[in-house]
Regions:
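Conserved beta-strand segments of alpha/beta enzyme cores
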Residues: 15, 91, 116-118, 160, ...
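Residue-level signal for inorganic ion chemistry
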Residues: 31, 83, 165, 202
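Class I SAM-dependent transferase core
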Residues: 1-66, 70, 100-117
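Active-site capping/gating segments
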Residues: 90-93, 167-208
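A short glycine-rich, Lys/Arg-flanked "PGG" loop and its adjoining helix->strand segment in the class I
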Residues: 148-160
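Conserved SAM/SAH cofactor-binding pocket of Class I
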Residues: 55-138, 148-149
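Conserved beta-strand signature within the Rossmann-like core of class I S-adenosyl-L-methionine
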Residues: 158-168
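Short "lid" loop at the C-terminus of a central beta-strand within the Rossmann-like core
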Residues: 125, 143, 166-170
Length: 208
């Protein structure tokens, strides 16, 4: 598994040390253990977790912007935990309303010694941070119009919302409010995952 993690991450532009890879393997071990009792994820075997959780998360590593990152609807901590592990210079706030999932995230943060992660049990739409986040991550959170309405209070003029999607969401893009624009988009190829993946980068403001 360590070799799969290192080689898969390298294909995504992430240079994992052996220590990083061992910590990611430890994360998946903890997830598998907790999952037997708390049903945190539908992916139950470790080998599938490598692609569906860790490498899928690391696929957006190169698109992070700024130091303050929010992961909304983080679930069991993806994509936030793997990204925080390989980006210790960034500060990650992992947000979910589900108590058992945030308890797992908090456990993983302690177990892995992640000093740059703040787990937060809350409804995203109720948050009013003192400062906007630089990047807001969302993996399978909601259709784009609903996502943007929910995360708007977390965003400033330079915030980038990274929406991780499966198939290209043309109908959702057609329904975007005019106060948002697509700043960029990318097709993602995740090693070991034979499924469509794309990333939509959104910013507030109308393009000129």
């Amino acid at each position: 598994m360590l070799e799969r993690l290192v080689h898969g991450a390298a294909a995504l532009g992430v240079a994992l040390t052996e220590h990083d890879a061992a910590r990611l393997r430890q994360l998946l071990g903890e997830l598998a253990h907790w999952n037997r009792q708390f049903n945190l994820t539908g992916i139950t075997d470790l080998e599938s977790m490598v692609s569906h959780h860790v490498l899928d998360s690391l696929a957006v590593h190169r698109y992070l912007h700024g130091a303050a990152i929010a992961d909304v609807g983080t679930g069991a901590g993806f994509p936030g935990l793997p990204l925080a592990l390989v980006n210790p210079e960034h500060r990650f706030t992992l947000i979910d309303s589900n108590g058992k999932k945030i308890r797992f995230v908090s456990h993983a943060v302690r177990t892995l010694g992640l000093m740059n992660v703040d787990p937060l049990q809350a409804r995203v739409e109720a948050l009013r941070p003192e400062r906007p986040f630089d990047t807001v991550l969302a993996r399978a959170f909601a259709p784009l119009p609903e996502l943007l309405a929910t995360v708007a209070p977390l965003c400033g003029g330079q915030t980038r919302v990274l929406a991780m999607k499966g198939k290209w969401p043309q109908a959702e893009l057609d329904a975007l409010p005019r106060v948002w624009r697509v700043a960029d988009s990318h097709t993602l190829t995740v090693p070991g995952l034979a499924e469509d993946r794309c990333l939509i980068v959104l910013m507030s403001g109308v393009a000129h």
